[in-house]
Amino acid sequence: MPLAREVVDQLAISLGVCIRPVPMRCLDTTTGSARIVDIPCGATLESKCPPCAKRNLQLRKAQCREGWHLDHEPVIPATEPTDEQRYLVELRAQLQALRDQAERDGEDLAPWDDALAEVDADLRRSGLRGSVLGRTPTGRRRSTRRRQDAPDLPKRKKVSSTLGRVYESPDGQRFRPSMFITLTLPSYGRILDGAPVDPAAYDYRRAARDALHFSKLVDRFVQNLRRVAGWDVQYFATVEPQKRLAPHLHLAMRGTLSRAEIKQIAAATYHQVWWPPTDHVVFDGDTLPVWEDEVGYLDPRTGEVLPTWDQALDALADEDAEPLHVLTFGNQVDAKGVLGGTERADHLIKHYLTKYLTKSIAETCDPDNPRQKDHADRMADALRYEPCSPTCPNWLRYGVQPKGAKPGQAPGQCRGKGHKPEHLGYPGRRVLVSRKWSNKTLTDHRADRRAWVLETLGLSATAGTDPNRYTWRPIPPGDPDLPPLGQRLLIEIANRQRWRALLAEHQAQADDTDLSATEVVAA
């Protein structure tokens, strides 16, 4: 017989109730009353919370569908800064002036740097994007010439548009098709049933580095795509795992180019990783760098201070220096034309662009396939000591202090996403959407769904209360006022059943009204 608690979870999942809710205490500042509200966890993986993952999947489908064949230019309204943002920028300017004066006077800059960092954090929390300082020059210059082994790309004059070309049929019908593109990484060795035929000959090191930097290669492809197209190409892309556990890209593009041009762009796209070399292991086993306050990490054998991250990059300023790694796409490039509102477009959205969004990259590995499981384990071993970012502690293994080094770091103990087994090296976002895709953020799409429900129930989606009326506080575990999770789930299940019945009743009434109106017109 099943456990009662399991039945509760199953019923909650079937009704779309979050099974890992975050309890919050909501205080009404007007009446002084407080109540406990369960906020959905918002998980995107089905293994963590199926209802939240399904809800996010539906939002992504709507986002992809609305922007793919948009026939008008999206307009992003300018947002005026708030009073808080203006105040913080003014405060930032005053602190920067005082910090510069302290630097000229030879004073200690640490207090000023801490104050500036705190204001910068407040600016980010207020909703401002980017940095008030912009890009800080490092003094290092890198040649922008293309690699000699990369083919050149054509370049069209850019026009201010996000829409593709319009085609007209002989009978006068106008079409604005779009494209579906699939890009893969190169081969690292022969694969059979999702695992290498010869694991010893499989290039795990290259596979690991390609996975870690795959998002940068995608950025380069989009840059080249826009340069060749001549307009501001908009895209909705998802990064999915292949059976061989390597990431590949599905990209919905608004507008069209020829298949030959798409393949030419993919062949000419590359990304160079200009990081310090990792060919020579300096510290291994029990011999690891030691931390010294005010200095950083030292070589325990000689007492010498290890080169900092900036010093290691300065050593790459030599014209003869080679990048740590060069990424390219593989030969398998697929490009298809797609018309909006067709079954093919819906099929590509459901079965390619969003099919695996509720699963982690590692979940494509069949646990009942020992060869594939061993393949995943070998991939994890290859990633263990591979640096994933400038701040990765693995740089200590190769005699370089990571950027922003701090005590307690050690090779093989990086907590970055790329080193976690469920990501298999890919640390980036699974969904990549350009800013002018659907002219809506994911929050806007979520608000659309909420507005539809409220409208169906005959309620207003715009008549909101004072945003400052309620204050929200997280409830810590063990709070005596917090009911058990099972009890809270039962309450949410009852609420969901009541809401569904009410929604179905209003929909039925609306259908009857529409039917009656149709009958009157017909009469």
Regions picked out by a protein language model, each given a short descriptive name:
Residues 217-229, 265-277, 357:
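Hydrophobic, Leu/Ile/Phe/Ala-enriched alpha-helical segments that form helix-helix packing faces
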